[in-house]
Amino acid sequence: MKLIAASLRRLSLAVLTVLLVVSSFAVFTPSASAETYTVKLGSDKGLLVFEPAKLTIKPGDTVEFLNNKVPPHNVVFDAALNPAKSADLAKSLSHKQLLMSPGQSTSTTFPADAPAGEYTFYCEPHRGAGMVGKITVAG
């Protein structure tokens, strides 16, 4: 009887170890489907716009903001205009430091648990001129 109990314990331990190893791969493996998108800050013609002005992504995707024309620019996500209405989320996605030279860039990776919906962002120096964009996180 003791031999059977010892064998069952060893078998249980082996099964638990295998399950732990397999589940750790599922948890810690980065998403293979995560993509990077580029949004230009200023159009190629020098207009004060984001190109593209609207973008649809998935949670876990990265958006690179590339300073193109008519600097300075930055990227600020509106705290009131995101699905969670969260100032903390908006702050974590924003890049308030001004990009002064064409070719400079900054990037934002949307968290894997980012709420689905529309996120509005703008350039602080040029918001009044209509430099506003929207990113939709697909659910």
From Swiss-Prot:
Membrane topology note: Peripheral membrane protein
Positions of Cu cation binding: 73, 123, 126, 131
Segment forming the signal sequence: 1-34
Keywords: Copper, Electron transport, Membrane, Metal-binding, Signal, Thylakoid, Transport
PROSITE patterns given in the database record: COPPER_BLUE
InterPro entries recorded: BlueCu_1, BlueCu_1_BS, Copper_blue_Plastocyanin, Cupredoxin, Plastocyanin, Plastocyanin_cyanobac
Domain of life (superkingdom): Bacteria
Main localisation: membrane
MF annotations from Gene Ontology: copper ion binding; electron transfer activity
UniProt xrefs under Pfam families: Copper-bind
Function recorded in the entry: Participates in electron transfer between P700 and the cytochrome b6-f complex in photosystem I.
HAMAP family: Cytb6_f_plastocyanin (MF_00566)
Designated name of the protein: Plastocyanin
